[in-house]
Amino acid sequence: MGLLAVSRDSGDTLLACRAGDRFIPGSNQKLYTLGAFLLEEGPAARSATRVAARGKVKRSRRPDGTTEVALRGDLVLHPCGMPDIVPLLAPGSRGLLDSLAALLWTGGLRRFEGTLWIDRGLFADEAPPPGWAHDDFGYSFGAPLNPLLANGNAVLVTAREEGGRVSLSFEPSGSSLDLRDAGILVGPPGESGWLIPRWIFGTRTLELTGLVPRGGTVRRGVAVSDPDSAAAAWFLAALRREGVDVKKAAVAMLPAGRGSGGRGEKPRNRPPATGTIAFGDPPAVEGWSAV
């Protein structure tokens, strides 16, 4: 156990016990973290996740007076560092990404062809700290955080037995996840099934062992190893669900920051982007800039 208590008035250390060590957070850690945030920022604190657009824009006027926008160029997703923790209400849904896609549709976006950039400059790109239980990495509750998603950094794996063979699938689809059967047995009908996930570090391969009853199905929530690329894939999927025609879309990552004080260094090689659209207000068509 480690503990550090600091006076908010003077800044003096009141109590320190292994204060410099890093530990696996307890399940009640969120209470202290949330309490500290509310004390510092207040319950009315808000921060904006932004989408910026750069490229060639074609506008067309519809008979009903609305304007439709076709963008050929870049979309840049700038997270604010407040990950989405809303309930996942539907298969494949990701609350924040779904909301952004809906705002873009409301603003007139009907077609996108180009590159989706994910700004990774806010959080440090570092491995889990020493002492973290490796067995937790594969499970959904052990999923890594990124500035966009918290409980959304996971997928639901389904193992289904048919004809003596076990097939594996996951939802939502789109993330670059490679599932590998590392020893899933077929048990008698009606037997309780189970799955144990294990990541192959340095890859996007997830090995699964377990047991599936004959003719049955077993499901398990598992973590994604690269939440940034997964968020990009799910954002494009959310755009498609809204009705945006996504053509030949590529995904690119801006460099990760150092995460100093929660404010990572500015990422280098940032593509120039204009027409910033703030999350929270429907993006106006005039917010798109043609270059």
Task: Identify the function of each model-found stretch.
Residues 39-291:
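Conserved serine DD-peptidase/penicillin-binding transpeptidase domain
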Residues 1-17, 251:
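A short, well-structured edge-of-sheet supersecondary motif
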Residues 7-9, 27, 38-41, 81:
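Short glycine-rich, polar/acidic loop-and-turn segments at beta strand-coil junctions
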Residues 16-36:
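Short active-site loop at a secondary-structure junction
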